[in-house]
């Protein structure tokens, strides 16, 4: 599971439409695009699906081409080897001027499994101890599992048994996004790490391994 509390600003690419949930409640849905430039100079135009309380009348305010700022809960998952970002908000959606900069900032809550490479200890250029590790979250799509990887940087090294290769962890930290060769890279600056105690359902999913 990868869940983030974020604020993002971008351009609406498909006008809002009224929809009805399984519970019969009306809401609006639209897509927006936020561009990200990576350290390697490549750019990724990332599309985000947004859902918010509303109806056909309020949907008319959010037409394609308008720049908006949305705050809410962002869910990140893989499907058909593509990374999808779905943002749910209960807050007011702010309509912005064209000069308002693109952005996506916030915090991340991650539950998943540390890679077989484990945790690397190293020193920064200023000699400060740090750690880095990668971990994945798995999602089941029909009969197949897909894996979303996150790269973590920990500025306060932890040397506990639960922070090691093939261990399940729950991580909270600052969401950071990068682009490498035109593909979105998920990163997180760690604030806290704890062992993730799996229930039977989560355990069955988490036992799946990327090939």
Residue ranges and their predicted role:
Residues 65-79, 167-180:
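Flexible glycine-rich surface loops and low-complexity tracts that mediate binding to linear polymers
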Residues 53-55:
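N-terminal intrinsically disordered, low-complexity, charge/repeat-rich segments that act as generic
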Residues 49-51:
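Intrinsically disordered, low-complexity regulatory segments
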Residues 66, 83-85, 106, 131:
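Generic beta-strand structural signal
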Residues 71-100:
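Short, structured interface segments
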Residues 1-5, 9, 16-26, 37-44, ...:
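Acidic, gly/ser/pro-rich intrinsically disordered tails
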